[in-house]
Every structure is written in structure tokens, then in C-alpha cells.
Amino acid sequence: MAEPTITTTYAGQFAGKYISAALLSPSTIDGGGVTVLPNVKFKEVLQNVATSALLANATCDFDAAGSTVTLTEKILTTNDLQVNMQLCKSQFFNTWQSLEMGASQFSDLPKSFQDYLLGYVAGKVASEMETTLWQGAAGAAGGLTDGGFTVLAAAQLPGANIIAPAAVTAANVIDELGKVVDKINAQTNIYGFEDTRIFVSRNIMAAYVRALGGFSVAATSNAGVDNRGTMWYADGGGVTFDGIKLFMAEGLPNDTMLAAQISNLYYGVSLLSDTQEARVIDVSQYDGSDNVRVVMRMAAGAQIGVASDVIYYGV
């Protein structure tokens, strides 16, 4: 079968499903770890409202003198991003053919070769965005204007809300998580809220799972959750610490944690913007090669709403 010649362009809202796959598929976003603002073209104003004591003794008059309302703002600025990738068409076309003919166990098949290529690239972008969302430097090429959440936290949080990290192992993970919860109670009022999370790196989650398996103490005195040892986590269920849910953020660097409410971490994207684009360009008809180029244009940014309500364990 001859290889197809394909040149396809999706622009504006028609590019949405491909840009959405790239921007909303990072594991943190897909798992509901942050608040997504879907239609930010350049800037979004995040308004914070603080009030003084509102209740007073009843009188016959209206008297607002005792109630003070303070409005502050944070700005979420998106950065225009692009993907320019050149792929050898024949290598991917063979894989796509096998998928179309049923030589695969996957049930969701690409309807066309360009869908397959765009899906492949979107998956790569999503993986890169997960890391950028958490630890990308401010203003870095291909990154976010103000940086990822750890960069924002290091720059915005009061010193009392930042904990110097240690090398976390199964032997000390309970103590290190305890430091975070102690700071939550001492410096914020977010304990007990349904959307409060402690976002942890992979190695911290692994250390905690092992610790709960009973191997951070004498095996004779602790056989782990339900006496199952490290097998207790076989179902992959969620875990908590001192009543707070843990969220494994794959983009966090090792030995890093961030405690916050989901409603206080913002991720802005341009899903509804007419400036986004997803394009597949077959250049074989122009230069005789067997190459196809994939182009995507989008925008994304991150911001913390109220910095004083966040605890950061990291550098």
C-alpha cells in the first residue's frame, strides 16, 4: 500500500482536541490536581478577597465601619508555545497500519494517519508539560512565563512557609511529612478542607508506601497495613497522612513536597483561543523526502492564588 500524502490544518477551536490532549493530559492536570482556567489568551486576574470580622451586635442602622474588605490581585500570564517536529513518515505509517488492521490490543484507534501523528506528539508534549508545570524556570524557553509551582513557591512564600528538604527514605519519611503538616497547622488555615493536598515527588510516595508496609521499623512489631507488608498498596489506592490526601505529582523533583488547596493552584491555557493551531505538513511532495512535519501553537501559564496558604518543602 502506498504511503499517503497528508497536509492537515486545525486552527482556533477546531484544534481544541489536539491542543487539549497536549495541555490537559499531564498527570497532575488529568488527576484534577490544580484548577484549570481554559480560556486565557494572555493574562488572567486572580482576585483575592480578605475581610475583617463581619458579625456585630444588631442595631437599627446600617453600619459598615466595622467590616473591612481588602481586595488583592495576582496575575496569571500565559506564554505562547510552539511545537516544531519533523518525523519520518514511513516509520510511523507502518505502526499506524498495524493499528488500523487490528494487530493491536488497543481499542481506541486513530481515524487517520494525521490523527495518529498528532496524538503521538500531543503525548510527548503532555509529558514535558508535567515537568514544566512543577519545576520549569521562569521565562525559560518553551516554559511558563512565571515558572512552575515550585519556582513560584520559592519566590512568593514567606520564609516561615518553606522547609529545608532532606534526602527522604522509608526511615524518615514519616518525620518529613510531619514537618509539612506541622507547618500547615502553624502557618495556614487549610487543614481539614476537602481539596487540601500534599503534593509529593515519586521517591517520597515510594518511601511512604514502604514505610506503611512495616519495613521502616522492626518487622516483628509491625507487618504493615492489614498485615500485608509492602503488598498493601497493590491496588494503587490513594493514601493520606494525618488526614490529608497525598497526591503524587510526577513532575516534582525528588525530595520535594508542596501543600496547598487545589483551588489555590491555577493553570491557564488557551483551549478556546483562535490563535491555537495543530498542523501536519507532508513535505515529501516538495523536497522528495519521506518526512512529515508537525506544528502546534498554544499558550499556558501557572500561578499561586494566595501564597501564604501554601507550604513548600524544597529548595
Per-region residue spans from a language model:
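Sequence/fold signature of self-assembling virion shell proteins
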Residues: A2-A53, D146-A171, V209-V315
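Short, flexible loop/turn elements at secondary-structure junctions
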Residues: K89, R202-I204, E250, M298
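Ordered core of a single globular domain
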Residues: D175-F215, A219, G224
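Alpha-helical scaffold segments that mediate packing/assembly in large oligomeric complexes
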Residues: S98-K183, Y313
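Short helix/loop capping segments that flank catalytic or ligand/cofactor-binding pockets
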Residues: T95-W96, E130, A207-V209
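Assembly/oligomerization interface modules of large self-assembling protein complexes
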Residues: G16-L99
